[in-house]
Structures are given as C-alpha cells and as structure tokens.
Amino acid sequence: MDLKRNLPLAGMTLVVLVGMAANSLLERAGLAGPAIGPTLFTLIRLVGGALVLAVWSAIRRVPLKRPQANAFWLFLYAAAFSYTYVVLGAAMGALLLFFAVQLTMFTGALAGGERPTASHIVGGLLALAGLYILVALQLHRPAPWAVVGMLAAGAAWGLYSVGGRGVRDPLAHTTSNFVYAALLAIGLAALRLSARGGPQTMPQLSGVLEALISGAITSAPIYLLWYALLPKLRTVFAATVQLSVPVIVGFGGWMLLGEPVTARLAIAGALVLMGVGLTMRRTGQKASRPDTPAPDTPA
C-alpha cells in the first residue's frame, strides 16, 4: 500500500465526514426549536451555498452549466430532510436517512458495473448495525409521511452522490447544482407564502445564522470536496463510510461539549469502523483503466 498516495485521499475523506457531522449539528440546532422553520432554513442554506460557489466560480472564470438532475436531487434532499427532521428527531432521522443512502448507492454501484463482494455486503450490514445500536434507545413510532419523506431525502442524497462519480469539473457541477437547487427552494418558499397568505412568524437571528453557516460553510465547500473525491472512490465504500457521520457527531459531543462516551457509542463506533474497513478491502477506490496503475485503497 502506497501510504503517501493514500494519506491525502484519506485526509480529504475525513474532512468531508467531519463537515457532514458539523452540518448535522447545525441543522439539529436550527430546526429543533422555534428559531426558524424548515422552508426558510432550506432556502437560506441553498442560497448561501449557491452564493459562495458562484463567487468562487466567477473568480476562477468557471461558466455555469445547464441544469441537471443532480440539482433536483440536492433540492429534494435538503427540503425533505428539513421538513421531516422536525417530526422525526435526530435518532430516527439518522437511521432512515442512512438506510436509504446505503440502499440507493449500493443499487447505483450494481447499475454502474461494480460487483460488491461478500466482505463489502457484510461491511455495510455491520456499519448499519452500529448505527442502529447508536440510536436504538431513542427510536419511536413516527408519522408515516415523515418516514416516507426521510427515505426520500436519503434516496435523493444517494442519487446525488452516485451522480458525482463521473464529474470532471467538481466546481462547475457543484455550483450549478446549488444555483438551480436554490431557485427551486425560492419557488417552494413562494408557494408556501402564497398558501399561507404571508409569513406566520418571524425567524430568530440564531436560526438564520445557523442556516447560513450550514449552507456557506458546511454544505457548499464540503459537497464540492465530496464531488472531487467521488470519482476516486468505489461507490460501495463511499456509501458505507457515510455511516460514520452519526458516530462522529457523538464523539464530537464528547470532545466539544463534555458529553459522556457511553458503551453504546463505543460499540457503535467499533462496528461502523469495522464495516468501513471491510468495504475498503481491495476496492476502496474505483478500478483504474488498464493502462493506468491502480491506486491503493485509502487507509
């Protein structure tokens, strides 16, 4: 294994996962209380991310691409997650979201010609088991519409990720996705305002800031890096490694907030790491062309 070649890739993957975990914490803080509603949170998040990427693209003189399906998947993920998270809560939401992500991306891997081995399947199941152990005590019987909504959010994120495998210009594609997703969010907000006859309550500054930080800092740059990484990773590995996000959130609470490390968190973390490790075996990265030496699996 060429450690020098794999360290940058592993480091960038870790940055993406930590960014996703930070985004999860921001959304939890913003949507858990009355500071901001899901429609406005989604709007500010996507518009904030679009503005950051548009400025970056203008500086780099990268033209805006035509809208593609990935822009819709990004919008659907952001909107469905925001609306259903309010009802489901963190534990049930995480379980349903990442289950749908796994199923969608494994299906995408098969459709794309990848052939997961037994170790990949066992790894994915182990990581899912770790996630279940982490959230099991907080599960409840949710509203059926919220379950469907969160599964739709997970499927949309899975499709958005699968759609990034063949991207050659991550900045151009991510900017386009955010710009057109933001336009869809503006349309959604206009429909909601029209249906209600105007805003019902004014958002609090804290909620607006959390949505803006979520979009401009922990969404747009992180998703750009994710699109830069996806062509270098096997879809199976990319799907399974995301199951570590709730575990990172748990350990982040220990490091930053002084929350205790419970036996459930430790066991869940171990299972997720074991599962991710199994999906890294031999096929952590996409197979290279015959004339190109295949890089090693990141570790």
Where are these regions (language model features)?
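Glycine-/small-residue-enriched transmembrane alpha-helix faces in small-molecule transporters
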Residues: M1-L40, F72, A79-A80, L125, ...
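Hydrophobic/aromatic residues within transmembrane alpha-helices
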Residues: G30, F41, T84, L110-P116, ...
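Transmembrane alpha-helices of multi-pass small-molecule transport proteins
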Residues: P34-L76, A100-M105, A156-Y160, S176-L193, ...
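Specific alpha-helical transmembrane segments that line the substrate/conduction pathway
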Residues: L40-L43, V47, S82-R115, A153, ...
